[in-house]
């Protein structure tokens, strides 16, 4: 059973963001279902339910989904030695084109699906990106407590819950460089992610506090890379981090657009030292 | 106590509207779930509803639209306790006082005693004519699949009526796209699908957190501007039917808010998905 359909549905208008497309956290909402269904098919649902291992998701957003888009997800195990690797492709149900790839890893999980159960990964390769050498210059971008709506079917803070918080952090960080709600509305410019690197060390439970700090790991002509780190504010222990690569988008042309000089100036002040 | 009681009061939030630019059907059911539970409690049937284990039917007529910012309330009453429990709910525009949507609900096989004074004799909702469902469902196409998530649950911890209808709405988007009523077409052609009647059937055995569902859909009627979608939700492991929805509506001119004939290329695609009746 290499590739199986693990989700089918649509993008609702209330799942779209100020960039006027399906927001990242709702992709991840569907991937959480797809992952559990694939795990069940592989006999690994109990392991996923139990948790206790780190997970990584490398995501490439190639084509936009917008309000009313019909889509489905195909999923498969793509490797099983050392760390389990699970692939998911989000497919536009109208055109049949892959809109987004999720390359997921369960670190240290030595599950070995049968060879005939492994699929060939036809998504992009995700090259390592340089990491910041010092996180002291991250700025506060989000804080709160895990609420019932953040939980997944296993009763922990779910993938979608986490990414919603990282989206809030992106809005806060955007505002800090001048990409405010007013600016987005009047200048018709916004931030659109094309790549996400999500690392989850552990999943907090109901009522646990978290905070997110954010910095800028890259500043190009139109491109920006936000690094968000979610931590337990009491212990400082890292919960998750999201590395979000994107561009400033012209909301009408749906094409990258250079940052205005005043925004660039602010953004430069938030650049992190890179290794 | 009057037979009719107010069981909900509130408003339509902008994020509860859909691509047809009005209050989306699943959120009507979000409010009806509350109204139904409040009415059941008033009638002494709260525990019956909580325990579940009986099939429910919801016949719904949408007469006027609610849009972002609309203020509305729901009035509810028991209509009968003969041959099961029958409950009525009417959505009322809080500004005009007009009833705009009616829910005629049946709890099949539930024996209950309600005082005569609590039975409303003035149901002003429509009669729902019998509609024949197709006998052969082999030509239904896949339109939704997923797992029951925490947000799909109702206050009793089962997949709620709102969660079920959200999945049927996804199915409606998928079958719409299959006939060419895509997101792009809706945006540029300014046409959407607007429902005027719902027939929901929910099986006695409910589904819970983490359970898998699959929806399949076909077209049970194709008129000039009208379409009737038949959606069937089932458990893919056992094939057991969880719920079904007969959704009658029209293609709507989004600017005039009036029915509009299907474009020929959409009609051609739709004809291929019409089920034998």
Predicted regions and their residues:
Chain A
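HotDog/MaoC-like acyl-thioester-processing domains
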Residues: 6-7, 58-70, 76-138, 200, ...
């Amino acid at each position: 059973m290499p590739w199986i359909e693990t989700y089918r549905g649509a993008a609702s208008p209330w799942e779209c963001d100020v960039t006027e497309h399906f927001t990242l956290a709702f992709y991840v909402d569907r991937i959480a279902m797809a992952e559990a269904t694939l795990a069940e098919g592989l006999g690994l649902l109990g392991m996923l339910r139990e948790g206790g291992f780190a997970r990584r998701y490398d995501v490439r957003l190639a084509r936009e989904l917008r309000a009313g888009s019909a889509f489905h997800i195909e999923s498969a195990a793509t490797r099983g030695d050392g760390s389990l690797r699970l692939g998911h492709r989000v497919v536009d149900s109208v055109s049949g084109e892959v809109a987004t790839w999720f390359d997921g890893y369960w670190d240290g999980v030595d599950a070995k699906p049968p060879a005939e159960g492994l699929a060939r990964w036809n998504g992009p390769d995700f090259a390592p990106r340089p990491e910041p050498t010092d996180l002291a210059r991250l700025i506060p971008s989000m804080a709160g407590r895990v609420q019932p709506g953040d939980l997944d079917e296993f009763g922990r803070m779910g993938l979608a819950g986490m990414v919603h918080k990282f989206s809030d952090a992106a809005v806060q960080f955007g505002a800090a460089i001048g990409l405010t709600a007013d600016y987005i509305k009047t200048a018709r410019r916004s931030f659109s992610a094309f790549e996400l690197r999500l690392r989850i060390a552990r999943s907090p439970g109901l009522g646990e506090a978290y905070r997110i700090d954010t910095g800028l790991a890259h500043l190009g002509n139109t491109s920006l890379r936000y690094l968000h780190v979610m931590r337990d504010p009491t212990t400082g222990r890292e919960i998750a981090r999201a590395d979000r690569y994107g561009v400033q988008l012209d909301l009408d042309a749906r094409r990258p657009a250079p940052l205005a000089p005043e925004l660039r100036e602010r953004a430069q002040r938030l650049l992190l030292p890179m290794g | 106590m009057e037979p009719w009681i107010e069981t909900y009061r509130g408003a339509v939030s902008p994020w509860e509207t859909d691509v047809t630019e009005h209050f989306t059907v699943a959120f009507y059911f979000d409010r009806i779930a509350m109204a139904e539970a409040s009415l059941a409690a008033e009638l002494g049937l709260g525990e019956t509803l909580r325990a579940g284990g009986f099939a429910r039917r919801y016949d719904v007529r949408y007469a006027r639209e609610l849009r972002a910012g609309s203020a509305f309330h729901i009035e509810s009453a028991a209509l009968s306790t003969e041959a099961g429990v029958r409950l009525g709910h009417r959505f009322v525009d809080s500004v005009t006082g007009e009833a705009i949507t009616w829910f005629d609900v049946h709890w099949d096989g539930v024996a209950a005693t309600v005082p005569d004074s609590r039975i409303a004799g003035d149901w002003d909702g429509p009669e729902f004519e019998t509609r024949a469902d197709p006998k052969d469902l082999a030509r239904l196409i896949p339109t939704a699949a997923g797992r029951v998530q925490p947000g799909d649950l109702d206050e009793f911890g089962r997949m709620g009526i709102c969660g079920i209808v959200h999945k049927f709405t996804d199915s409606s988007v998928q079958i719409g796209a299959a006939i060419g009523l895509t997101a792009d077409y809706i945006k540029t052609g300014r046409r959407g699908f607007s429902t005027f009647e719902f027939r929901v059937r929910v099986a006695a055995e409910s589904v819970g957190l983490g359970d898998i569902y699959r929806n399949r859909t076909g077209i049970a009627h194709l008129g000039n501007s009208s379409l009737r979608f038949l959606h069937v939700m089932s458990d893919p492991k056992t094939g057991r039917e969880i719920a079904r929805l007969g959704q009658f509506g029209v293609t709507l001119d989004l600017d005039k808010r009036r029915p509009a004939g299907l474009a020929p290329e959409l009609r051609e695609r739709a004809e291929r998905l019409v089920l034998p009746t």
